[in-house]
Structures are given as structure tokens and as C-alpha cells.
Curated annotation (Swiss-Prot):
Modified residues (Phosphotyrosine): 223
Subunit structure as annotated in this protein's UniProt entry: Homotetramer.
Chief place where the protein resides: cytoplasm
Annotated residues for binding of beta-D-fructose 1,6-bisphosphate: 157, 172
Protein name: L-lactate dehydrogenase
Gene3D superfamilies the UniProt entry points to: Lactate dehydrogenase/glycoside hydrolase, family 4, C-terminal (3.90.110.10), NAD(P)-binding Rossmann-like Domain (3.40.50.720)
Subcellular location: Cytoplasm
Keywords: Allosteric enzyme, Cytoplasm, NAD, Oxidoreductase, Phosphoprotein
PROSITE patterns registered for this protein in UniProt: L_LDH
Organism, as annotated: Macrococcus caseolyticus (strain JCSC5402) (Macrococcoides caseolyticum)
Gene expressing this chain: ldh
EC number annotated for this UniProt entry: 1.1.1.27
Pathway membership, UniProt: Fermentation; pyruvate fermentation to lactate; (S)-lactate from pyruvate: step 1/1
Length: 315
């Protein structure tokens, strides 16, 4: 689809995830102007210079610069990757207290600029912090999006593709719920090239035992990567890039993001990972993918987990 002209993206937080996202943006050429905001001014300026030197080989012209919160006033999209890092052995939800304070100050500064675009949140715990950004900013719910389970879904599709020796693009299935320990796989709706996974397993019963392993490996992938190299950033950066392109190119594509529920799935007042249609206005619509009884129960528990975390801050 045609790219809207005058696209401006602001990145807040130029750490491992943020800088990986910036590099992905340069390689995919989805915006015209890219601004980096970070407390470490020298690194942000250095990255802007480094990225600009690669523009000549990028698919489209893009201006990259270091900036301040004043640059947010005419941005189409602000991507927040700032916050305290997740440490080995620490769950995403352990981070909430530290990052809530950081986010309040960031969002206040952004809104002072007159910003009225779309927020895309990546910092963990992403569902709770996306909820916080909507509350802090006062923007309409459709204009505040979290990365949600977009990476979990990608991991899920990758692992299934490896097991069945097909392209991940031919694997269709979702991880929904909290981006964290209470997430769940929608096994009942998973298919490979239109063939129900349940039907495939009936024909290949020897693979049945591998299914739970695939989910566990999907859910716990971040912990394994953090143990090995200290942080995850390439995968989530690509997920952020996919959401960004859906917004900037007005794609109306379905992605599993953290979206606000208002009665969908029988729940409300929570941001959580669900399939949603994404376009230039942000979240056009939350889609209610069919769930079986067990999946509904697990999803309800995931909602409870997130509400228990956010309630002390927004009761």
C-alpha cells in the first residue's frame, strides 16, 4: 500500500531494543524522518550519525537526527523503548514499579509538545505500561498500542514451522494474553496452510507430545535468551517494525498487539495481547478469535494477572 508522505517517527529510549528498531527502520525505509531521544545524548547523536551514513544504501531517503521532546509535536508515531532493563531471573511484572515512574515523566514531556499521534510501547511489562500511557496521556484508546504478544506469536510460528518443516508464513496461530508467564496459545485456531493443527496431530500422534514443549519454549524463550546474552532485542525490534509499517502504511492488517478491551472476550479495562486490525489510526478494531473453554479460562486468568498489577496504581 502507498506510504503516507510526511511520516515522522520518534524513538524514546536508544538502548539495545531502541537502536535495533532504528536499524530495522533504516533498512525498511518506512518513514521520512526519524528522531532519537535518549538520556545518553552522546550515544543518541552517535547513532544518528552512524545511521545517516547508511541512508545511501537504504530503500528510501530518511533523515535521522538526535532530538528532544519538542520534536514530538508533529510526529505520526512515537515508539517508547525506554525504561529499566529486565535482569536475569526477574519477570516482566517485577519491573512495573520502576518503569511506571519513568513513563509518567516521559509521557508528561511528550504531551506538553502537543503530540496527537500514535504511541507504540515496547517496555516491559508492556501490557501494564501501555495501559499507563493511555491514562497518563489522555489520548483515545486506539492511539495507544503495546507490542503485546507480537513477538510471542512470531516465536510460536517459528517453532511450529521448524517442527513441521514449512515456512513460518504458512503457519497461522496466535499467542494471546499477557506478554509474559500467563500467556496462552490458541491451539484450537492454529492451522498450517489451512489444515487444522488438531487434524494434523490426529494423523501424526507421535508429534502430540511436542506441542506442549513448543508452547513452553515459546513462553520461556526470553528467559533463555537473557541468560545467554543479557537481553532480547532483535526479535522485538522486528515486531515493532512490523507494527510501525502497518500504522504508517495504513495496512489494515491483523497483528497480535496489546489493545484495550471494552467487552471483547468478556473483559474490559485492561490492555492485553489480542489480534487487532492495525492502520493509520492505530487500532481499528479488536478481533475476537474463537476460544475453547480451556482457552477462555486461561485468558481470564491472564486478565486477572494484569489487573492485579495495575490496580494499585490506577484504583
Amino acid at each position: 500500500m502507498e506510504k503516507f508522505k510526511g511520516n515522522k517517527v520518534v524513538l524514546v529510549g536508544n538502548g539495545a531494543v531502541g537502536s535495533s528498531y532504528a536499524f530495522a527502520m533504516l533498512n525498511q525505509g518506512a518513514c521520512d524522518e526519524f528522531v532519537i531521544i535518549d538520556l545518553n545524548e552522546d550515544k543518541a547523536k552517535g547513532d544518528a550519525m552512524d545511521l545517516n551514513h547508511g541512508v545511501v544504501y537504504a530503500p528510501s531517503p530518511m533523515q535521522v537526527k538526535y532530538g528532544t521532546y519538542e520534536d514530538c509535536h508533529d510526529a505520526s508515531l512515537i515508539v517508547i523503548c525506554a525504561g529499566a532493563a529486565q535482569k536475569p531471573g526477574e519477570t516482566r511484572l517485577d519491573l512495573v514499579g520502576k518503569n511506571m515512574k519513568i513513563f509518567k515523566s516521559i509521557v508528561d514531556e511528550i504531551m506538553k509538545s502537543g503530540f496527537d499521534g500514535i504511541f507504540l510501547i515496547a517496555t516491559n511489562p508492556v501490557d501494564v505500561l501501555t495501559y499507563a500511557v493511555q491514562k497518563f496521556s489522555g489520548l483515545p484508546e486506539n492511539q495507544v498500542i503495546g507490542s503485546g504478544t507480537i513477538l510471542d506469536t512470531a516465536r510460536f510460528r517459528h517453532l511450529l514451522s521448524q517442527e513441521f518443516n514449512v515456512s513460518p508464513n504458512s503457519v497461522h496461530g496466535y499467542i494471546i494474553g499477557e506478554h509474559g508467564d500467563s500467556e496462552l496459545a490458541v491451539w484450537s485456531g492454529t492451522n498450517i496452510a489451512g489444515n487444522s493443527l488438531y487434524d494434523i496431530l490426529n494423523e501424526n500422534p507421535e508429534k502430540q507430545k511436542l506441542i506442549e514443549e513448543i508452547f513452553v519454549n515459546t513462553r520461556d524463550a526470553a528467559y533463555e535468551i537473557i541468560k545467554a546474552k543479557g537481553a532480547t532485542y532483535y526479535g522485538v525490534a522486528m515486531g515493532l517494525m512490523r507494527i510501525s509499517k502497518a500504522i504508517l502504511n495504513n495496512e489494515n492488517v491483523v497483528l497480535t498487539v496489546s489493545a484495550k478491551l471494552n467487552g471483547e472476550y468478556g473483559h474490559d479495562d485492561v490492555y492485553i495481547g489480542v489480534p487487532a486490525i492495525i492502520n493509520r489510526n492505530g487500532i481499528r478494531e479488536v478481533l475476537e478469535t474463537p476460544l475453547n473453554t480451556e482457552e477462555k479460562e486461561k485468558f481470564a486468568k491472564s486478565v486477572e494477572t494484569l489487573k492485579a498489577i495495575q490496580t494499585p496504581f490506577f484504583s
